[in-house]
């Protein structure tokens, strides 16, 4: 009697081009690539002699990575799909999505099914599985606000583990998976808790201005109104990666203490800032970069976008080294002029 097919078996793609798998469009290559469509494939990796001893990189939408060289290992393309309501109670829906689901499509799906909450995070590039790694955020909302739990596979052992918010240790564009857990886990599913009592988050002036331009008051705004406003803002400010390669916001907004902020404001009274609950102050990195004269400037084939100084772009043929050189030049100028350190959001490999 024939053996049933092994659903965990990997089909390896040798010398695989990665330009289509990173939103910068950088033409790196991987020694091997493999498309992962189910958690069992991640769980079986450590038993596969072809890849068990190779460096491994889990890649979703490729919107948070800069390849500075070819990857001499196996790139695991996370394509695990699925969306479902796993349970609900009187207060909330608990919605699970596969790690390979497109983030924006998932947000749109929750709204279409009457489960709002994530609309401020619309149009952020990448996958559901990448969202907790970065604790993605925009327009006054971080993903952690609606996070319930996730399931991840430890690549070295194939062990499946559940992480709650405490174990994920979320920070500003940060989590356990960017620190101690970096490179160790593949996120296969994420569950979100979406409250049935919806409260709009309209603290950002860009959002209220866009609503006002549409004739919508904050009091009358629906979840769909907020979603549409955020999509319109992002499309106006950020270039389409399919047209102009980029990774969205390249730098984190730096957070400094009150004393450093007072000194900075004495030199630059119009500095754009956002007070934080702990007494620290978040600065607008785009404003700092613009003040240093970088908006629209280029180094080789890498450039600063002419409408959004926080976005670095590939004008065509840029290498990862070009992007990194531009980023370092910007960091040096901001440090020299303002005494502030800018930290890159994407992972540079």
UniProtKB/Swiss-Prot annotation:
Q: What is this protein called?
A: UDP-N-acetylenolpyruvoylglucosamine reductase
* Pathway recorded for this protein: Cell wall biogenesis; peptidoglycan biosynthesis
Q: Per the entry, which co-factors are needed?
A: FAD
Key words of the record: Cell cycle, Cell division, Cell shape, Cell wall biogenesis/degradation, Cytoplasm, FAD, Flavoprotein, NADP, Oxidoreductase, Peptidoglycan synthesis
User: GO molecular function: any one?
Assistant: UDP-N-acetylmuramate dehydrogenase activity
Coiled coil location:
none
Q: Provide one Gene Ontology biological process annotation.
A: regulation of cell shape
Give the source lineage, highest ranks first. Answer: Bacteria, Pseudomonadati, Pseudomonadota, Betaproteobacteria, Burkholderiales
